[in-house]
Swiss-Prot record:
Protein's UniProt keywords contain Phosphoprotein: no
Keywords: Cell inner membrane, Cell membrane, Membrane, NAD, Quinone, Translocase, Transmembrane, Transmembrane helix
Subunit structure and binding partners: NDH-1 is composed of 15 different subunits, Nqo1 to Nqo15. The complex has a L-shaped structure, with the hydrophobic arm (subunits Nqo7, Nqo8 and Nqo10 to Nqo14) embedded in the membrane and the hydrophilic peripheral arm (subunits Nqo1 to Nqo6, Nqo9 and Nqo15) protruding into the bacterial cytoplasm. The hydrophilic domain contains all the redox centers.
Lineage of the species this protein comes from: Bacteria, Thermotogati, Deinococcota, Deinococci, Thermales
Protein name: NADH-quinone oxidoreductase subunit 12
Gene Ontology biological process terms in this record: ATP synthesis coupled electron transport; electron transport coupled proton transport
GO cellular component: plasma membrane
Organism (species): Thermus thermophilus (strain ATCC 27634 / DSM 579 / HB8)
Covalent S-S links between cysteines: none
Amino acid sequence: MALLGTILLPLLGFALLGLFGKRMREPLPGVLASGLVLASFLLGAGLLLSGGARFQAEWLPGIPFSLLLDNLSGFMLLIVTGVGFLIHVYAIGYMGGDPGYSRFFAYFNLFIAMMLTLVLADSYPVMFIGWEGVGLASFLLIGFWYKNPQYADSARKAFIVNRIGDLGFMLGMAILWALYGTLSISELKEAMEGPLKNPDLLALAGLLLFLGAVGKSAQIPLMVWLPDAMAGPTPVSALIHAATMVTAGVYLIARSSFLYSVLPDVSYAIAVVGLLTAAYGALSAFGQTDIKKIVAYSTISQLGYMFLAAGVGAYWVALFHVFTHAFFKALLFLASGSVIHALGGEQDVRKMGGLWKHLPQTRWHALIGALALGGLPLLSGFWSKDAILAATLTYPFGGVGFYVGALLVAVLTAMYAMRWFVLVFLGEERGHHHPHEAPPVMLWPNHLLALGSVLAGYLALPHPLPNVLEPFLKPALAEVEAHHLSLGAEWGLIALSAAVALLGLWAGFVFFQRKVFPAWYLAFEAASREAFYVDRAYNALIVNPLKALAEALFYGDRGLLSGYFGLGGAARSLGQGLARLQTGYLRVYALLFVLGALLLLGVMRW
């Protein structure tokens, strides 16, 4: 029952704030919501330290409501509630004075409750409840300022695109049920230790579940919703689109590693999609001018790295990057929020610059976040990214092509990370006046996230240094044999990874301080700003034709129904008109008789 309590605590916050939040004064709703998330973190940590926990209750015939806290789900619980708590505290200051203050924290708590349902689920239907729940909560949070039509449209777009992936999730569950008669993750894991039932159909189930992950984690081709999701308040971007919801797809693959480890072709497809998405996100980040959209495309790219790791079979490495990414990406979003707060809502990086001297604490948060993203040696992002690069060469579904592609993306990542930092904090001031530093309630969470961005990678250092995370996670994951590199080869790859990161950071720092750019770069930047016209292509090839078809069907239905109901109306009107002729006066009938006879004679003569 205590395990269920980790979900019920934030759910209680949602209920209390939804019912009584308007009667509470600031900052009480934020304090209450943050306190309940912290309580959930402490409860989950205590259960994990005591050896894990289970909860099971009757739900549907043959489908119990089952929860499991093992090392994998416990690891995700600590990320969701730990980083989530810091973002809640930050939002107390960021959302101050907003008329929807209590509503915001109600939605925030709902999201945490649904995310915990997703990660603790021991069956796919229970996971799907959390899956849909975080989709609903993200819809409410992205469209939080719903009176702005553009923001409301962005929320709908995110919701609809994710439904495509959700359909894949449901169909995948249906196939697994048909094959094995159960959707319990623990039971399926045991069943697949023996001979596989219908490998082709099982591969289709794996692809369909992967489609669900593609939608939730914004992978090619369903990545178009995430940049538009920046319409929500900045803490929403940090919580949902950096640390938690968008990594749900990676978690689904890791939790289903018993399935994907026996499907090499599907795993290879996952790795290919991951690498392509990593490259697409990195290239698209260069042209963005919105401070949050640069970080959003970076998120797409980093999620691609995670899928690449999971695809080659390095499930624990993918989760390692989930962990480090939660810190430095949340830090980048919240540092962006502090900049937006300092500039009175301005988000265009072309109107920034020179903020280094005005924001003495936020500048360090931003620098640490950018360097961790860029893979500066010894920061957390370096260790997890290096582990991904090494995994492409040592795990069974990897290969040299994956390594080279990931290495090139690492250079691009370091360059656009420096572009973001240079445009915002360095150079001359452009278009802003009297920026002010964020209040302490917004700075302290960033201090802790910055600390995590530096230190989180030290949980899994390369051989022969200590690696705590791999032995902690591996018992909950499928066993995939990886061949080990020699010590010299391993550290040679680390040196190459470090050199590539330093080269990219230096090149980005130098190149983006220029005032005039070459023509080739301006052409590339223009295409990058439009994300290489993918959205436009989708609108032209899919959205607009479907919209035209829907409108044609609508007007066709309306005309058909109007005609159908019009026949009855016409008969009724005719009857009412004829009824008026029945007056009961003999002279009227005589007149009508004479007129009818004359009409008949006229017709006969004609």
